[in-house]
Amino acid sequence: MRFCLFSFALIILNCMDYSQCQGNRWRRNKRASYVSNPICKGCLSCSKDNGCSRCQQKLFFFLRREGMRQYGECLHSCPSGYYGHRAPDMNRCARCRIENCDSCFSKDFCTKCKVGFYLHRGRCFDECPDGFAPLDETMECVEGCEVGHWSEWGTCSRNNRTCGFKWGLETRTRQIVKKPAKDTIPCPTIAESRRCKMAMRHCPGGKRTPKAKEKRNKKKRRKLIERAQEQHSVFLATDRVNQ
């Protein structure tokens, strides 16, 4: 009787060991299949056709699409155009919803724009907004040089004189209100000049120089000659009519 009980106990123990061995063997085979399949790397649950369906705790689940096929992956960081969204059940890669964004911190805050676009306060622009200047080294919009309003046009002058010439220059200016964030960013023009007609061509009480007198006399002689030629032409025309 004792021998029968002892034999039965051995059979039960062997069955338990066998079941445990079979379970361990199944788990080892499952882990081995994960390792042998590249898309199952980092997965807690994976299939050959659909890839990962659950990821390890610190990894992000990403649903990759290739043509008509899609499969899950577990990644340490999300690819371009996606950001990592952590959640209690499983971390996921979510798509950036910002136009022309290459990498983002969240769905509405970009950290890097696509080529040809400038980053400004979490958005991407092809041209920086007013008051900001493009910094090509980092493709960001930084605070530019801010200037005030133009002053009124100054007095028309030439050689620091306001008389004695027919034409002169008048100038207006504006002040730099805020310096740019980078010294390499230029400021707009803060002074500009234009041609103007002087109010007084001859200075009061001034004496004309010999050169000015000669020029004036030449002009008078030229006008007298032109007038005489006109009168002579009229005389010839009248004479022909009378003949």
Curated annotation (Swiss-Prot):
Under PROSITE patterns, the record lists: TSP1
Q: Where is the signal peptide?
A: 1-23
Q: Where is the TSP type-1 domain?
A: 144-204
GO CC terms of this entry: cell surface; extracellular region
Specify residue ranges for compositional bias: Basic residues: 204-224
The record, for SUPFAM superfamilies, names: Growth factor receptor domain, TSP-1 type 1 repeat
Which Pfam family would be a valid example here?
TSP1_spondin
Q: Which cysteines are joined by disulfide bonds?
A: 40-46, 43-52, 55-74, 78-93, 96-104, 101-110, 113-124, 128-141, 145-187, 156-163, 196-203
Give the chief site where it resides.
secreted
Which Gene3D superfamilies does the protein's record reference? Hormone Receptor, Insulin-like Growth Factor Receptor 1, Chain A, domain 2, Thrombospondin type-1 (TSP1) repeat
Annotated region described as Disordered, given as residue ranges? 204-243
Q: Which UniProt keywords apply?
A: Developmental protein, Disulfide bond, Glycoprotein, Heparin-binding, Secreted, Sensory transduction, Signal, Wnt signaling pathway
The places in or outside the cell where this protein is found are: Secreted
Which Gene Ontology MF annotations are present? heparin binding; signaling receptor binding
FU repeat intervals: 90-134
Biological process (GO), any one: embryonic forelimb morphogenesis
Keyword hit for Protein transport:
no
**What are the glycosylated positions?**
160
- Domains (record comment): The FU repeat is required for activation and stabilization of beta-catenin.
Instruction: Describe its function.
Output: Activator of the canonical Wnt signaling pathway by acting as a ligand for LGR4-6 receptors. Upon binding to LGR4-6 (LGR4, LGR5 or LGR6), LGR4-6 associate with phosphorylated LRP6 and frizzled receptors that are activated by extracellular Wnt receptors, triggering the canonical Wnt signaling pathway to increase expression of target genes. Also regulates the canonical Wnt/beta-catenin-dependent pathway and non-canonical Wnt signaling by acting as an inhibitor of ZNRF3, an important regulator of the Wnt signaling pathway. Probably also acts as a ligand for frizzled and LRP receptors.
Name of the protein: R-spondin-2
Q: What is the lineage of its organism?
A: Eukaryota, Metazoa, Chordata, Craniata, Vertebrata
User: What is the gene called?
Assistant: Rspo2
